[in-house]
Regions:
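Structural preference for solvent-exposed beta-strand-turn elements
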Residues: 1-264
Length: 264
């Protein structure tokens, strides 16, 4: 494999893909991000959470196709510090990176050892503005319970209907946030783990675009621009949170001093 890429766009995508790499993976090969010159994608996974970044716009020239495994801890500093607009990435028995400031040779596992990462979000996509989704995540994720054995409370419940409803609780606190959806999709729900939602928030901040979501019985997919992220759902049944809320049509408005209220 021998490919020339634009340094800054490729680096940006590599940093996003590397953000989901587990610090202590069960399989050593999962410490790497796979660069597939055939599909022009970067792929990373921990077998629970997977990401695919389309880097076609960053690939300038493919002299010979193939695959490379990039160790983020080593490749990212090289791309940050080397300067120049373009970088050559080549694989023979080793990974070779040629930059404006010099060449680097790194060892890497066989790319064929990396698990296949395929993300399909072609059907029943629900669209939501990126800012609205990021706000909904921020307003609920703090109320999750990630430390107890009640695994169903370790994520945020996503209910898709005429709008998106996000719910989280740790048994003491209950947080609910709602936002509008674009288009009509079948009603569906699933519990999304905390770590994937943190990754989605980072992607929205980096890409600044809308998000398409697909939830099925076992997984959820989020697509933002050139980035697709797939996660397994949390198993278990989420509590009937609507029974916790007061069932009354009466409403009241309470005004208070924000500074004093927050100091209580």
């Amino acid at each position: 494999m021998k490919v020339t890429v634009q340094r800054i766009p490729f680096l940006k995508s590599l940093e996003i893909a590397a953000s989901i790499v587990a610090s202590r993976p069960q399989n050593e090969v999962l410490r790497y991000v796979k660069f597939d010159a055939d599909s022009k994608t970067l792929q990373a996974t921990d077998n629970e959470l997977s990401i695919v970044c389309n880097v076609a716009d960053a690939v300038q020239y493919v002299a010979s196709p193939g695959k490379a495994l990039l160790l983020p801890a080593k490749v990212i500093p090289i791309l940050k510090d080397c300067g120049g607009e373009s970088v050559d990435i080549e694989v023979d028995s080793q990974l070779r990176i040629t930059t404006q400031s010099g060449g680097f040779t790194l060892s890497m596992p066989n790319p064929d050892e990396f698990p296949s990462v395929k993300i399909d979000a072609s059907e029943n996509k629900a669209g939501v503005p990126g800012v609205a989704l990021a706000d909904a995540i921020r307003q609920t994720i703090y109320a999750t319970d990630t430390e107890s054995t009640r695994y169903q409370l370790g994520g945020v419940l996503f209910e898709i209907g005429d709008r998106l409803t996000c719910v989280a609780t740790d048994g003491r606190r209950l947080a609910v946030s709602k936002c509008q959806l674009a288009g009509e999709v079948p009603a569906v729900s699933g519990i999304i783990p905390v770590r994937p939602l943190q990754a989605v928030s980072r992607i929205i901040a980096a890409e600044g675009c809308g998000v398409s979501m697909v939830i099925d019985n076992k997984s959820a997919v989020f697509v933002c621009g050139d980035i697709s992220l797939q996660t397994r759902l949390v198993e278990g049944r989420f509590p009937d949170w609507r029974k916790v809320l007061p069932s009354t049509d009466q409403s009241a408005t309470l005004k208070c001093d924000a500074e004093k209220f927050l100091s209580v």
